[in-house]
Each structure stands twice: as C-alpha cells, then as structure tokens.
Amino acid sequence: MNIIEQKFYDSKAFFNTQQTKDISFRKEQLKKLSKAIKSYESDILEALYTDLGKNKVEAYATEIGITLKSIKIARKELKNWTKTKNVDTPLYLFPTKSYIKKEPYGTVLIIAPFNYPFQLVFEPLIGAIAAGNTAIIKPSELTPNVARVIKRLINETFDANYIEVIEGGIEETQTLIHLPFDYVFFTGSENVGKIVYQAASENLVPVTLEMGGKSPVIVDETANIKVASERICFGKFTNAGQTCVAPDYILVHESVKDDLITALSKTLREFYGQNIQQSPDYGRIVNLKHYHRLTSLLNSAQMNIVFGGHSDEDERYIEPTLLDHVTSDSAIMQEEIFGPILPILTYQSLDEAIAFIHQRPKPLSLYLFSEDENATQRVINELSFGGGAINDTLMHLANPKLPFGGVGASGMGRYHGKYSFDTFTHEKSYIFKSTRLESGVHLPPYKGKFKYIKAFFKN
C-alpha cells in the first residue's frame, strides 16, 4: 500500500467514527476554516500573484471573498439544510410515515484546476464539510505556490485524517482517481474530465464534472454597445482570459460590429492603459505550455488582429487581442481558447446566431446583450447552456442562490450555496410503519382482494 492509498483508508476510517455527522462538528470546522483563510490572506494573495499575476483586488474578489461568503452562508443555513424531511405518504401505505434523511456520501475527492486555484478548492470543500464528508484535495500542480499555501492552511486547521491535501502531478492524480472514493468532484478540461469519469466508473463512483467549452456572447443590433464592451472586456480579460465561463467568442449583428470593435478597443485602454504589459491589473498566463498554445493560435490569426497581438515569453504575457473577420473553420474556433484572445464573428439574423450555437457542443455559459425582450426570451428558451447572463458576463457565478454547472460536454452536476451541500449529500429515504394496524390487503392469500387493491390505487 502506497502513501496515497494509506491516506485514503485513513480518511475512510475517520468518517466511520461518525464524528462528521454531528451538525455542531461541521459548523465548528467551517468556523475554523474561515478563521484560517483570514489569517492566511496575505500568503494567499502573494501566491496568486506569483503564480498568475493576479492583482490583489481581483484575487480577493474572485478567490478569497467569495469563499468566505460561502462559508458564512453554509454555517447560517446548515441546520435547515440538514433537516430530515417528512413527506406525504399515499393512503395505500397506511399506517406509515415517510422520511428523507440527508446523509454524507463518505470520503470524497476534490480535484482543482489552475485558473482559480484557491477558490475552486474551497468552494466544493465547503459543501463537502457542510454535508458531513471527509475529503482529500488535489490542488493544481501548475500553481505550486498556491498549492503549498493550501497545504499549510489545511494541515494547521484540520486533522489530517479528516481533510488531507495531496500535492503532485499526473501520477498522483492517476492514483487518486482509481481509488474507491464515495464521490469525486472534478474541475478542469473536458479531456481530463473524460479520464476522471472513466476511472470513477470502474468503482461506480458518482461524479461532478465542471469543465468548459466555447461560451458565446451574442450582441444584437439593439444592445447598449458601451455597456456591452465594458462587461465583455471584464468577463473575457479578467485573469488573462483563464476563466472557464469567460466569453470565448462574440457573435455580433453585422450592423453594429464596427461600433463594438471600436468600443472594445477603447475599453481595453481605459481598463489597462496604453502599455497593458505594465498594468498592475492585468494577469499572466499560468505556464509556458499554455503560453505557447495561445501564441500558436495568435500566429494562425495574424491577418485578423484588430487590437493587441503582442506577447512576451519571459513574462508569460499575452496582450488582450481582438480578432475580426473570423470564420467558423478558423483555427481559433476549433478549441476552447482559455486565454486573452477574442474572436468576433458576425450574423445577419437571430435565427442564424441560434443555429450557429446549436451546431456546437452545449456551452458552460452564454451571454446576450440586447434590449429586445423577444430576442432575450428566444435565446433563453431555445439554447441549452449551463448558466449565463443577459447584459452581463460572469456575474451569475456571484449569486450563491443560483446553481452553477455545465450541461453536455461542458459538464455534469452543480454546486454553489445549498447546491454544494446537495451535491455532497445522499438523500436516504425510509418509512416508519406502525405495528398496531395491518390491513392485510397486500398479503397472500389474494382471493377476494382484487377490488380492494384497485380501490387503494384510485385514492
């Protein structure tokens, strides 16, 4: 038995002590986690800057603040979330009462990505703790400074058999995903998600897969172009485009395309200044592998660049870039970009835009900028996507009352707020039947009972 396997079985043993099923225990662990995050705030911010070049305002808002808010909500609502529910019982089961009990799955695995390497560890972990599970966390090896801070924070806060962090790369992940966890929560690419899903299926382990895809933005002829440009630039270029729900491409009505490009270019200068590379508010690509993947896409689209296009390998810097005259068969349209390059395509009618999106895998997010209520309702009703926004980008993630998750190739399962608790909770059903009464209608011998059985099922 290797070290990882031993940690897994130690975690299973801790769960079997029944400690985590105590509601007061769970609330106390969430309280400890909140306190630890606050005490590690400066270390977390420094690590996020070192690994991804994140400005501390952006880092706090998207990584720390949102996590602390989730903990606060979970602690406040946990008593209600965990209540056993008494549900209606049909007359033919009289005298019986029916219940749904919320119970933890057991020992869960959380695999996190590099783009929001702190928040995407702790958001699912909050749900796992609130639901009463033990957990093993695998942070991304591509953000090693954040991973080290997470490990220190967890080790100083929790019993290692309760919450454990496994650092490492592909080898460690392969070992973990083949173990018989009670639940696996994965955030990352579609290709790796398929590997995780296949491995989990060997042990019939339920999974949540939070992946990505090419999330479109539709800008119609009625849109407020200034507002659209600001909100699209925020959604696309936050974290240097390394956001799973970032706008991947724009579908703009041909009549307002030039105005939109002008507005986007102006907004980028307003956000980051004339020398964007020197801006303290603009991030960096996580590593050279992803940098070279993105510069390869840029090189294939040199004739399409209408803004940006510059890069610096030493800094892993890629300038925010706008591409015009892009077609569906362009290289940039064949994969999720996951970087600061924004292709702009045109359409003539909403039917054409909807058909274009229908022809592609279901996106994790979709955004529409429009003042036309009919167009808005058509997009909402006719297109399938994980989540999205009308006249904004990204911000649907900020509401903990909304479930977040993909559909089709962009993922399965959902979380955030109570949905995180539900994800890591098994709803166990049972009935309680009195021993004082028994109709006997359902028991052999059945002679003469047919009409009574039919009568029961009519009620």
Swiss-Prot record:
Active-site residues (renumbered): 210 (proton acceptor), 244 (nucleophile)
Signal peptide start-end: none
GO biological processes: aldehyde metabolic process; carotenoid biosynthetic process
UniProt-annotated binding residues for NAD(+): 114-115, 188-189, 211, 336
One of the Pfam families matching this protein, by short name: Aldedh
Domain of life, source organism: Bacteria
Enzyme superclass (EC): oxidoreductase
Catalytic reaction equation(s): 4,4'-diaponeurosporenal + NAD(+) + H2O = 4,4'-diaponeurosporenoate + NADH + 2 H(+)
GO CC terms: cytoplasm
One Gene Ontology molecular-function label: aldehyde dehydrogenase (NAD+) activity
Consequences of knocking out this gene: Cells lacking this gene are unable to produce staphyloxanthin and cause accumulation of 4,4'- diaponeurosporen-4-al.
UniProt-listed Enzyme Commission number(s): 1.2.1.-
Assigned keywords, A-Z: Carotenoid biosynthesis, NAD, Oxidoreductase, Virulence
Pathway participation: Carotenoid biosynthesis; staphyloxanthin biosynthesis; staphyloxanthin from farnesyl diphosphate
Record family assignment: Belongs to the aldehyde dehydrogenase family.
Biological function: Involved in the biosynthesis of the yellow-orange carotenoid staphyloxanthin, which plays a role in the virulence via its protective function against oxidative stress. Catalyzes the oxidation of 4,4'-diaponeurosporen-4-al to yield 4,4'-diaponeurosporenoic acid.
UniProt-recorded name of the protein: 4,4'-diaponeurosporen-aldehyde dehydrogenase
Originating species: Staphylococcus aureus (strain NCTC 8325 / PS 47)
Lineage, top ranks: Bacteria, Bacillati, Bacillota, Bacilli, Bacillales
